[in-house]
């Protein structure tokens, strides 16, 4: 076969490379009458060709242009600049790496490709055989040998990515971890199969999930009796948490890697996929949207308040898309489409910040609510265990008296708020609450309520100052494997009934004053639908019991989820937690006052500034559709820009 070599860059002439021999070893005798053209060039020329014919705005090592003819096979372009860099990084000579590029290009001219794993295995196998005949080693051996380092590094990025959330608040670690994982898993242009992309991303997803949710198994060991029964499930629980992450948190990386799109479009796909996963976590299998990426911005009031515009969904889309766009700009050394993506997400963030600044201003307006006293008992779960019915009854009576005593002098207080499950007796809908009667103040208290059909609710009971229970709210989002058993063969400590969903409640304080609030029991505060969008409320009343989690990160992250709820809804939060953190939270997510973890005491306060945000007005699902449209529209513009 005849090989025509064109020296478009004179630097090539100093290398003694037999291009004709290399090309003929590839084709053998089958193409002895054929011709191929090899042009030896530099990064500038191959960059222009790569952009013109492949829509890739960057240089590459080799380009092949197949003519589809048995005589004129086609043209191969090889860049000396890229070959020199890659040869230096691989620790081989320029001549050896050039031989590989010729072999690689020749197989492209013969119709081989590497768009899928199966294609890559066939093509790489043939390349290795030819290079062995030429006396060169397997160029893919190092990649295969050291591939495990990428898995380790990806897993490490996942493990430390959770440090951006409370109580550490090292947001830059999360940003760098996502950027590092994106660089390893998504930034390359080569397409890989869905399953290979998934396997590569599993270490990040699994380690990210375990490092972020490990504290959930802490609850097993709070009470010795429960520990004896459920400790055996610790390891399966951690494995399950890892599997959860390997399924959900890898989706953005997998899609950005296995879908063959232009580099400038990838940030829109990646950010959109991150928002999709968060939206899915809001409702799939009862939902668990804990720690959206948006929450790493809570240390910055103006940035986090952009959630009042487009919610955690929108801020997650913007933050993750911005991270990906920065990586693509660095990886590709610029490019119009990459710069467009970067500017798009920066502008989106600035728009959110502008709206957030407005939300902060509005949150400082309005009249104060009624004075609420939060009671934080800090009773351990173990101390609630009784050995007999008599002990249990006596213990419950003692605890009622302790709760009354702990409330103290309430003459300057309008309402007394107790945390989740603090009332030691089960209540019926027509029962009275003696604590309210004794204090002569309306009381909101966490209790188990048994309705007339003997269904048991984890509830917020509301009693007037006469002691009469006038209303109760049953928790709607129950904790899987804790408050109910979604899988029959896996035991659960309780089997409670789910309530009817988000609603508005009120207390008539006097003739002209009514305190209107939205109840949220425990982790219901993490869901975007905690407040019905068409109703005005003075506050969200959130009762919780984080005694199960002690001083683990989960307790502090739960507090941040309440702050997120305040920002998204534009409604201040009054939060009573059994062991802390109890707090008054402004409508802008600002902590007005709080009782730390493990501190017994009371906290008096008022809230103001409740208003309607654009996020609450449109709702979670509408904003999800808007975000997806922006992802598609932005990606299309980036594609057209690159094209």
Where is each model-derived feature located?
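An acidic/histidine-cluster motif and surrounding catalytic segment
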Residues: 1-98, 110-145
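Active-site-flanking alpha-helical
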Residues: 98, 107-112, 219, 285, ...
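Short active-site segment of divalent metal-dependent hydrolases/proteases
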Residues: 103, 107-111, 215, 281, ...
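Membrane-embedded alpha-helical bundles of multi-pass enzymes
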Residues: 146-362, 551-552, 565, 577-582, ...
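Short, conserved active-site loops that position catalytic residues or coordinate cofactors/metal ions
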Residues: 167-180, 208-219, 376-377, 412-428, ...
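Active-site catalytic loop in hydrolytic enzyme cores
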Residues: 218-240, 273-275, 279-312, 456-528, ...
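CN hydrolase (nitrilase-like) catalytic-core segments centered on the catalytic cysteine
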Residues: 245, 272, 415, 421-445, ...
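Soluble catalytic regions of membrane-associated enzymes that act on cell-envelope
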Residues: 355-480, 504-519, 523, 531
């Amino acid at each position: 076969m005849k090989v025509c070599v064109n020296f478009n860059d004179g630097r090539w002439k100093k290398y003694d490379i037999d291009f004709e021999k290399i090309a003929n070893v590839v084709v053998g005798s089958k193409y002895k009458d054929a011709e191929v053209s090899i042009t030896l060039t530099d990064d500038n020329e191959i960059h222009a060709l790569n952009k013109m014919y492949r829509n890739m705005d960057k240089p590459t090592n080799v380009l092949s242009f197949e003519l589809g003819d048995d005589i004129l096979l086609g043209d191969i372009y090889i860049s000396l600049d890229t070959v020199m860099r890659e040869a230096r990084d691989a620790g081989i000579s320029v001549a050896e790496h050039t031989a590989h590029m010729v072999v690689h290009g020749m197989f492209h001219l013969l119709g081989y490709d590497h768009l899928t794993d199966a294609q890559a295995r066939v093509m790489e196998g043939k390349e290795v055989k030819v290079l062995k005949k030429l006396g060169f080693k397997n160029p893919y051996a190092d990649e295969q040998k050291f591939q495990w380092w990428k898995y380790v590094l990806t897993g490490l990025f996942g493990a430390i990515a959770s440090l951006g959330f409370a109580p550490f608040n090292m947001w830059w670690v999360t940003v760098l971890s996502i950027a590092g994982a994106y660089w390893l898993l998504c930034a390359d242009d080569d397409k890989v199969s869905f399953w290979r992309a998934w396997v590569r991303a599993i270490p990040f997803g699994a380690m990210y999930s375990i490092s972020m949710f490990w504290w959930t198994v802490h609850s097993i060991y709070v009470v010795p009796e429960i520990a004896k029964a459920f400790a055996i499930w610790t390891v399966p629980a951690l494995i399950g948490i890892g599997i959860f992450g390997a399924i959900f948190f890898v989706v953005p990386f997998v899609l950005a890697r296995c879908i063959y799109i232009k580099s400038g479009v990838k940030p829109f796909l990646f950010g959109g996929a991150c928002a999709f996963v968060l939206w899915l976590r809001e409702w799939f299998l009862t939902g668990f949207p804990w720690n959206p990426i948006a929450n790493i911005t809570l240390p910055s009031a103006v940035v986090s308040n952009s959630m009042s515009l487009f919610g955690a969904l929108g801020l997650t889309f913007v933050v993750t898309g911005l991270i990906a766009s920065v990586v693509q700009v660095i990886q590709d050394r610029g490019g119009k489409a990459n710069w467009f993506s970067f500017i798009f997400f920066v502008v989106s963030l600035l728009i959110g910040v502008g709206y957030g600044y407005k939300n902060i201003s509005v949150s400082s307006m309005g009249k104060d609510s009624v004075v609420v006293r939060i009671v934080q008992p800090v009773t351990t779960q173990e101390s609630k265990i009784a050995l007999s019915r008599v002990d249990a009854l006596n213990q419950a009576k003692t605890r009622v008296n302790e709760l009354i005593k702990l409330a103290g002098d309430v003459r300057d207080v309008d309402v007394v708020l107790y945390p989740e499950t603090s009332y030691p007796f089960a209540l019926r809908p027509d029962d009275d609450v003696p604590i309210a009667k004794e204090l002569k103040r309306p009381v909101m208290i966490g209790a188990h309520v048994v309705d007339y059909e003997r269904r048991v609710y984890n509830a917020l009971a509301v009693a007037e100052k006469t002691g009469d229970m006038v209303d109760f709210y049953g928790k709607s989002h129950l904790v899987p494997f804790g408050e109910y058993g979604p899988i029959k063969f896996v035991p659960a400590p309780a089997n409670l009934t789910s309530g009817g969903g988000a609603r508005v409640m009120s207390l008539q304080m006097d003739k002209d004053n009514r305190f209107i609030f939205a109840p949220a029991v425990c982790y219901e505060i993490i869901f975007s639908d905690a407040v019905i969008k068409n109703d005005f409320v003075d506050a969200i009343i959130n009762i919780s019991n984080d005694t199960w989690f002690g001083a683990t990160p989960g307790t502090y992250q739960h507090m941040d989820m309440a702050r997120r709820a305040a920002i998204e809804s534009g409604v201040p939060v009054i939060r009573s937690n059994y062991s802390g953190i109890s707090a008054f939270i402004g409508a802008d997510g600002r902590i007005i006052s709080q009782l730390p973890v493990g501190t017994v005491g009371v906290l008096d306060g008022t809230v103001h500034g409740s208003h309607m945000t654009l996020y609450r007005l449109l709702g979670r699902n509408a904003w999800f559709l808007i975000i997806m449209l922006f992802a598609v529209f932005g990606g299309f513009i980036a594609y057209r820009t690159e094209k």
